[in-house]
Amino acid sequence: MVVKLVNNELKILSGKLRDIFREIYNKIKNDENINDRNLDDKVLSLLKDYTISEENLKIKFSEPKDEIYSYEGRRTPYDLLCYGIINGKNFLIFINNKFGDLKSNTRNDVTTYNNLLRLYLGIKRQRLTSEITINGELVYNRISGNEIVSYGIFVVDKYRRGYKFFLLEEIKDDFYVNPRNNMFQIRYSPNLGDPIDYFAFVKKLIDAILESLEKSLNSIKTEILVLNSIKIQLINIKEGKHGED
């Protein structure tokens, strides 16, 4: 059993970001033209020059910086990069803007599990392969808390009933990866608590991925059996053996 320790710096950052995104929501809530197509650009325009500089804390924002996908192509696994220093530690928080229904219990796509693993483990390849070797120094720095990484969600309710901001590390619900499309999915109003530490989060994510892949594998095996049965029936029909005992 993994002890889920609270990441205190991440708890501070989460509080600061909630305050910031409350301001952002107040600036856009009465804009009837805001929708899922222009939300990203609007948020970026409001935050690209925004800076917090306090004792032991510096926060800045920029467009996504991804070595594989381009921001212009709208294919990056997040929409806004928050970065800076807290208590002498560098941090990166990848933020995904969403325009949806806060009252719905439906799970919504965030990004593929592959993208989340890339971001948290510092993997610089598009797809996971057996040739990938994890950067031990980088991951150890994150496990030990010397470097902070997180993924945040900013949700604007499409019916203008408010907003939410939270980190994936704060979600108390079980993680879910859709076995059909490999998407990490969440409800927009999940149960939240203090953010868990890096190791506990990544392990929880990998466990959810493994569960999803096992479901997918079992489904594929069943489909193979069904297709083989159909093929045999098709051959028998062609050879005039249908209806025979």
Curated annotation (Swiss-Prot):
Known role: A P subtype restriction enzyme that recognizes the double-stranded sequence 5'-GTNNAC-3'; the cleavage site is unknown.
Reactions catalysed: Endonucleolytic cleavage of DNA to give specific double-stranded fragments with terminal 5'-phosphates
EC annotation from Swiss-Prot or TrEMBL: 3.1.21.4
A GO MF label: type II site-specific deoxyribonuclease activity
Protein name (Swiss-Prot/TrEMBL): Type II restriction enzyme MjaIV
Entry keyword annotation includes Glycoprotein: no
Lineage: Archaea, Methanobacteriati, Methanobacteriota, Methanomada group, Methanococci
Any GO BP annotation: DNA restriction-modification system
Keyword annotations from UniProtKB, A to Z: DNA-binding, Endonuclease, Hydrolase, Nuclease, Restriction system
